[in-house]
């Protein structure tokens, strides 16, 4: 948590002025009981109305000055707290963006969202409260006790006994509740994760009639969060009754001692009222101080969770730009040299001894069953993950030697899940190349077989895509993501099962258009359809993380049993579909 305070360094002035103005407010507040005592003893007791009005004016003046100081302090505290959280949120977002896929998979999306939102909001609240109360509350507690001694020493001894008792109660409650705060936040992570998963998979859940099962699982995770919050709440609710019992007993003691001394002529009625007011001030400020300490500990727990993310360093370090300039022009476009790879947290290898070479301009097909390692292979080329053994080279250089920006500028990737962002179609396509002309955009749209999609929308390129592309079908999203990658005009184009939602005729037209792209482009097509890859220069057959066959379509039909089984299981069905679609 302490390391996060560097984001307050631009607000040093506010961090000084906020508590300073709160101290000024507290100072004027400590004077109020003495003024009240004077009004009672010197005004009301002798019916001196002018004196009462004068001192009443002093009270109003003290209230106005205190109000001004309070508003000013709140302004500076809010400015510092909001500025702090803004800088912290940006720094955390930037750090998350720098993490590799491996770290992102380990942490989890819902956890990161919680830490970006709920945790940072809690830390912001903690900073605000600290700046306003960390000096004010202790100052009033001790100031009120000192002022009580100036009024009457014997009655003030009650304060000496009361304050330690109150402190024991406050800190006992705090010590019991603090360890539970982290469990509450972890429970919130679970609830948010479950909610996110259900919202994203709502159609699947309903298709399989799993609403009741998901509701039961949500009830369990929500129940855990509720139980933790109830336990914390029960412990926290002990504070007010216990503190009020102690303070009311103390007030009774002050009144009893003060009453005896009033009858003895030692102190006045106004001074007894002042002592009671000081005791009330102590009560209020100790409760505030307790809430502050609880809030601080919540903020520390949340701050530590945020710091945990900052301490996670990306396992992928960018290479030097000097290495980029040393690219071998005649080298293979992509080379896998005995590559093995494991995902974080997995003891088993996801890829084992993958070895192949791809020349520039070649089209490579990758096929295999679900979970065979197809996507894992292509994810190593733009270095989304790192190899555990072997080496991946692009243009003759190890991908680890490349500057990441330079490496990924060479590569266009279309993921399995078509992701579009809120904005116009044009804005989404320009992710590939911000400087692309409109002609280049339409050319990419044509290659991706998305011309009818764009022209059919109101506004065409200006058509507004909703968040996540909710207002587009699966096939439309896939074609637009392919167009976005084509706009980039990369040296290497990777299509990771990105035509799965397209019919056979459209898929065939897409492959034909890709073959006719300008430039010596190297294309990787990951697919479960043999028809999508059978005309590739090389086909890599994946099974259980291993390349069990590499060759052309004809060679693999003769030499690779797995490929032959895949082909024979599909070709009759595909022939029927192609006849219906008129694809070939």
Task: Locate the predicted segments by residue.
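Helix-loop-helix
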Residues: 48-52, 57, 147-161, 231-305, ...
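An intracellular "coupling" helix at the cytosolic face of ABC transporter transmembrane type-1 domains
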Residues: 10-13, 98-102, 118-127, 131, ...
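Transmembrane helices of ABC transporter permease
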Residues: 10, 14-27, 62, 128-184, ...
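ABC-type nucleotide-binding domain
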Residues: 326-584
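Pre-NBD coupling/linker segments of ABC/ABC-like ATPases
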Residues: 314-329
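Membrane-integrated ABC transporters
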Residues: 1-32, 36, 44-58, 73-77, ...
């Amino acid at each position: 948590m302490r390391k996060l305070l560097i984001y307050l360094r631009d607000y040093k002035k506010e961090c000084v002025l906020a508590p300073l103005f709160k101290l000024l407010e507290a100072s004027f507040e400590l004077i109020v009981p003495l003024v009240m005592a004077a009004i009672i003893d010197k005004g009301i007791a002798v019916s001196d109305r002018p004196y009462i009005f004068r001192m009443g004016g002093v009270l109003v003046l003290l209230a106005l000055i205190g109000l001004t100081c309070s508003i000013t302090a709140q302004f500076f505290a809010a400015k510092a707290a909001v500025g702090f959280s803004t800088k912290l949120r940006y720094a955390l977002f930037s750090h998350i963006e720098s993490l590799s896929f491996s770290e992102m998979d380990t942490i989890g999306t819902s956890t990161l969202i919680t830490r970006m939102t709920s945790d940072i909001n809690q830390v912001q609240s903690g900073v605000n409260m600290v700046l306003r109360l960390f000096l004010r509350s202790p100052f009033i507690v001790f100031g009120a006790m000192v002022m009580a001694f100036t009024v009457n020493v014997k009655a003030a001894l009650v304060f000496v006994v009361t304050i330690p008792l109150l402190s024991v109660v406050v800190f006992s409650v705090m010590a019991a509740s603090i360890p539970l705060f982290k469990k509450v936040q972890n429970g919130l992570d679970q609830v948010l994760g479950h909610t996110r998963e259900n919202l994203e998979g709502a159609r699947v859940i309903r298709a399989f009639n799993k609403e009741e099962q998901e509701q039961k699982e949500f009830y369990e995770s929500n129940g855990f969060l509720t139980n933790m919050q109830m336990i914390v709440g029960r412990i926290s609710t002990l504070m007010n009754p216990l503190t009020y019992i102690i303070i009311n007993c103390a007030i009774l003691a002050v009144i009893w001692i003060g009453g005896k001394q009033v009858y003895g002529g030692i102190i006045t009625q106004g001074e007894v009222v002042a002592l009671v007011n000081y005791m009330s001030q102590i009560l209020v400020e100790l409760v505030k101080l307790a809430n502050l300490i609880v809030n601080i500990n919540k903020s520390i727990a949340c701050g530590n969770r945020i710091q945990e993310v900052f301490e996670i360093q990306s396992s992928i370090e960018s290479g030097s730009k000097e290495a980029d300039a040393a690219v071998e022009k005649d080298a293979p476009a992509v080379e896998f040299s005995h590559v093995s790879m494991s995902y974080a947290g997995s003891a088993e290898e996801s890829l084992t001894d993958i070895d192949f070479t791809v020349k520039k301009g070649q089209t490579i097909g990758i096929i295999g069953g679900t979970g065979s390692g197809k996507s894992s292979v292509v994810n190593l080329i733009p270095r989304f993950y790192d190899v555990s053994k072997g080496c991946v080279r692009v243009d003759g250089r190890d991908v680890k030697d490349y500057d990441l920006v330079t490496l990924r500028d060479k590569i266009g990737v279309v993921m399995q899940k078509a992701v579009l962002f809120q904005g116009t179609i044009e804005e989404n396509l320009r992710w590939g190349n911000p400087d692309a002309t409109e002609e280049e955009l339409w050319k990419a749209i044509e290659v991706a077989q998305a011309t009818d999609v764009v022209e059919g929308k109101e506004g065409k390129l200006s058509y507004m895509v909703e968040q996540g592309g909710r207002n587009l079908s699966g096939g439309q999203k896939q074609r637009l993501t392919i167009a976005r990658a084509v706009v980039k005009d990369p040296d290497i184009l990777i299509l990771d099962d990105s035509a799965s939602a397209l019919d056979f005729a459209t898929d065939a037209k897409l492959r034909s258009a890709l073959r006719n792209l300008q430039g010596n482009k190297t294309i990787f097509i990951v697919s479960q359809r043999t028809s999508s890859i059978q005309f590739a220069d090389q086909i890599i057959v994946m099974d259980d993380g291993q390349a069990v066959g590499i060759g052309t379509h004809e060679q693999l039909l003769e030499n690779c049993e797995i490929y032959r089984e895949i082909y024979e299981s599909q070709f009759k069905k595909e022939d029927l579909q192609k006849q219906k679609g008129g694809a070939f």
